A protein has these predicted regions:
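Short, well-ordered beta-strand segments enriched in hydrophobic/aromatic residues
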Residues: 87, 91, 512, 521-529
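Solvent-exposed beta-strand/loop surfaces of large extracellular or lumenal domains
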Residues: 199-207, 274, 313-333, 548-583
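Bacterial Sec-dependent N-terminal signal peptides
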Residues: 1-20
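Beta-strand-rich N-terminal accessory domains
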Residues: 20, 79, 372-511, 517-520, ...
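Beta-strand-rich interaction surfaces with strong enrichment in secreted/lumenal proteins
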Residues: 73-79, 148-154, 217-218, 276-281, ...
Length: 596
């Protein structure tokens, strides 16, 4: 349980971050944009289009060629200057296109149509572009480029997400660089593709000759069409809280509540920072820490406490955090504080012999990075748990487990891995695809490590969540669900499962085949048997929001395309503002592809 909890905490950003948006109602946030840049309401492209279709309005930043050819002056520069920053943006590329985002106008994260590439390099999507020096000699000019850890690119024409956590280079008072720029993290479509990458200087194509503490966001605009939306950021330039010398009183005995006893402490002393390491025993003690907390500016500050046992955090006598916790449980509490000096107190007790001693305190305000107020060794690192990977290298692999889908734990799930690198999770109870992904197969650590308490497993590649619903309905009727279905098992064809169901409402048997098709997964639904309702069956291709029919035989939903042949689809409005794409069956079989 403790390991699971810690992994969940790691997956959650520490502390809230305030997203400032770059408004995309006009181009006023940018410095002298070329005529190629416009603001539109929406852009559309199929996975084979090299150009966008646009609809007028606002909300999407679009670069399209409006002259004879592209020029370097088509790069787009923000008026905003930044140092340390966390940037989040959605982007879309047509087929074969190329762009990039330069932090401070100097350090490029590559945007490229890398869809389907088996091996990726520094110039693929999510890569940190190489540096360049002509003096190194012909063929050796490029150096220090960093490939993404894996190919996390979606198909062209789909919206993709990019998050960049960037630490600017540091300079002394004389302007001499004393620390390099660092890409602390780059996350492409939910996958970490770069982490703690230090760049010794500017990458190729920078618009400045020298490094500096600040610079603009630069979007490469001279390599082809590209679109952006939801441009958000947080800069980390504000000062944060600091802690002065720490005094402590140490008591021994059985303590059940964090109340300082009236008796004389066993020992007292002073420390440069918070730490448990002055406690000579493992249990049956109470520590009372006091320190002066300096607040630089009026603001709301979040304090995050960690301890093994019970404790209480007070500021100016007001209790912020209290309770019994394990050392890897982060407990946050926020309070507004005026600039100046404040009194901070922590009372910590541990009345049981098992488990390690630990004590930690972090502070965060909007506009500054998280800062630890404890000694580094006072908060233990978690036990390292090796990845337990299920591979599907030589033949299809079927693996049962529980799985989370849209926040709910599903218990009748089978994961199907394929040597092609195209995999999916399937809800046997519902007859539904829960998620599809590309890359490595399955992380079974939470199922097989130690006691395997959660019994869940997770995809290891670029994942697109599906609606998790049975893909058939009778005309003008609600979509079938598990109450209408009787699962009859599966049989294997070339090692891949064919799932079988009795569909009671339609008095038909349904066979569901899902196979890799190069671009994605091909799903074939077959109706078996005779029934008067057989001619009324419709395939439900997607249910959700932001669905679009791009052309006859091709639709999109957030995360993937849906492609089929034959009948014309209908886009329906259903309950709660959702949409549904339906296509009538023609005969006893219907096939469609999921492409991402």
């Amino acid at each position: 349980m403790k390991k699971l909890l810690f992994s969940l905490l790691l997956a959650t950003p520490l502390g809230a971050w305030a997203q400032q948006a770059i408004p995309l109602t006009d181009l006023s946030a940018f410095d002298q944009p070329s005529k190629n840049w416009t603001i539109e309401q929406a852009v559309f492209a199929t996975y084979s289009d090299t150009l966008f279709q646009v609809s007028p309005g606002s909300g999407v930043l679009v670069n399209t060629l409006r002259g004879g050819k592209y020029h370097r002056t088509d790069d787009l520069k923000s008026k905003m200057q930044h140092g340390d920053i966390r940037l989040l943006v959605d982007f879309m590329l047509p087929k074969g296109m190329n762009s990039g985002i330069y932090m401070q106008g100097r350090y490029e994260v590559q945007l490229y149509d890398s869809w389907g590439k088996k091996t990726v390099k520094y110039d693929d999507c999510g890569g940190i572009y190489e540096r360049w020096d002509d003096a190194r000699g012909k063929g050796n000019e490029g150096y220090e480029g960093y490939a993404p850890r894996q190919n996390a690119s979606k198909a062209p024409g789909l919206w993709q997400t990019l998050e960049i956590d960037f630490q600017a280079p540091r300079f002394d008072t004389n302007g001499k660089k004393i620390a390099n720029a660092i890409f602390k993290k780059v996350i492409l479509n939910g996958l970490v593709v770069q982490e703690n990458i230090e760049v010794s200087g500017m990458t190729r194509g920078a618009i400045f000759d020298q490094e500096a503490p600040f610079g603009p966001i630069l979007i490469q605009g001279d390599h082809g069409p590209v679109a952006f939306r939801n441009l958000r950021f947080e800069t980390y330039e504000k000062p944060t809280a600091s802690l002065g010398e720490v005094s402590y009183d140490y008591y021994t005995g059985k303590f059940t509540d964090p109340i300082v006893p009236a008796t004389k402490p066993v020992s007292s002393g002073k420390l440069p920072a918070l730490t448990y390491r002055v406690i000579p025993v493992n249990n049956d003690y109470l520590m009372h820490y006091k320190a002066e907390l300096t607040i630089p500016e009026d603001d709301t500050y979040e304090f995050q406490t960690y301890w093994t046992g019970s404790g209480e955090l007070k500021i100016d006598g007001k209790v912020l955090n209290q309770g019994a916790h394990w050392f890897n449980e982060m407990v946050p509490a926020s309070t507004f504080l005026k600039a100046g000096k404040h009194q901070l107190e922590i009372i910590h007790i541990k009345d049981f012999p098992w488990g390690p001693k630990a004590l930690g305190l972090n502070v965060k305000r909007i506009g500054s990075r998280l800062v630890s107020l404890h000694e580094r060794t006072s908060l233990l690192d978690p036990d390292a748990v090796g990845l337990i990977e299920v591979k599907a290298n030589a033949e299809p692999v079927l693996q049962r487990s529980f799985a989370f889908h849209l926040g709910k734990k599903k218990t009748h799930v089978i994961h199907v891995g394929d040597p092609s690198g195209l995999h999916y999770s399937y809800d046997l109870k519902q007859g539904a695809i829960l998620q599809v992904w590309r890359g490595k197969f399955l992380d079974a650590t939470q199922m097989w490590d130690n006691r395997g308490e959660p019994q869940t497993s997770e995809p290891l590649g670029l994942t697109v969540v599906q609606d998790g619903k049975f893909p058939l309905a009778l005309a003008h009727q609600a979509q079938a669900d598990s109450t209408d279905l009787v699962y009859k098992g599966y049989r294997l064809e070339a090692g891949r499962p064919v799932f079988m169901y009795e569909w009671t409402a339609a008095k038909l048997r349904v066979e569901d085949r899902i196979q890799p098709s190069g671009n994605g997964l091909k799903r074939t639904l077959t109706l078996v048997g005779t029934s008067p309702q057989k001619t009324d069956v419709e395939a439900v291709l997607a249910t959700g929001h932001h669905l679009s029919i791009l052309q006859n035989g091709l639709a999109s939903q957030p995360g993937n395309f849906i492609e089929w042949e034959g009948a014309t689809a209908e886009l329906l409005k259903i309950a709660s503002g959702a949409q549904q794409i339906r296509v009538p069956f023609s005969g006893a079989q219907f096939t469609f592809d999921l492409i991402w």
